[in-house]
Amino acid sequence: MSARIEPDVRSMVGRVAVVTGGNRGLGWWTALGLARAHAEVVVTTRSLPRARTAVDKIRSLVPEAEVRLELLDLSSLGSVRTFVERMVHGSPIDLLVNCAGAVIPSREITEDGLERTLATDYLGPFALTLGLLPALLRSPHPRVTMVSSMGAEKGKGKIDFADLQGERKYSPQLAYNQAKLADLMFAIELGQRASSSGLPLISNAAHPGLARTDLQWGVHGRRPSLGIRFLMSLFAQRPEDAVRSILRAATDPAAISGSYYGPEHGLKGDPVLSTVYSGALDQGARTHLWSVSETLTGVRWQP
């Protein structure tokens, strides 16, 4: 791997980017791409010792990289608050990429009484983003990019508010799909609210298509069959290719709020603007999701 700037990534000289889950998987590739573009990158992680190796690898590939680690567990609202308190009064944040994701094989409840997949993949990023708004809005060109998934349109295709936390029936795949749909809905709604308030914030989303990452193996809590692994080898993108949609959403100077990037051919391909799933276009559902999210996290929209 070289230290060149990828063609989908504009120069980020002088800009500060926060990447959640930047110590592994697509989060790591996102952090690497932004470091190559000369951004100052803040990588968040739940475990500092394990993440140091990942950051050292970025520095070895990009010797001039400005990258540092910060502790953050998105499944814990207390951890989110502590991180926000450390960051919000510091340097302006130009870019927040909510890339961290988890699939929990069996239903777990966090210390806050929340289902863990929903907390990690959506409610934590919701609270984090609203908490960091003051730092983002000190940037002349602030941007938030939510990493969604093709799974957002699978299953029910809309948020099941009657069983949002899987109390009646828990499926790891459905929980993940619902959280990723919520991420996309949040990206659209945040952009609309920022625009209505006269704020310069761009809020968009991206999906990586089908990527060969650890997350793909974790959906059912077991190693996939030989047949599934063979199909993945045929149709899944390498992570360094899958990340291109995320990097384009995060850096494209022509991006607008509500835009959604993904591979040209769905599973793989060059990053292009994708069609937003119908479930995410329901204004009433987005408004209700926002209200529920504020209630569950205790974090309010205060532009």
Predicted segments, located by residue:
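Short acidic, glycine/proline-rich loop/turn micro-motifs
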Residues: 109-110, 271-277
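C-terminal helical subdomain
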Residues: 179, 229-273, 283-287
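A short C-terminal helix-loop "cap" of Rossmann-like NAD(P)-dependent dehydrogenase/epimerase domains
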Residues: 166-167, 222-231
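Alpha-helical packing segments of well-folded alpha/beta enzyme cores
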Residues: 54, 186, 242-245, 289, ...
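Rossmann-fold NAD(P)H-dependent dehydrogenase/reductase core
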Residues: 1-217, 295-303
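C-terminal amphipathic/interface module of NAD(P)-dependent oxidoreductases
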Residues: 278-303
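Short, flexible, mixed-charge acidic loops at enzyme active sites
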Residues: 157-164, 218-223, 261-270
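Pocket-edge positions in alpha/beta enzyme catalytic cores
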Residues: 43, 72, 234, 278-281
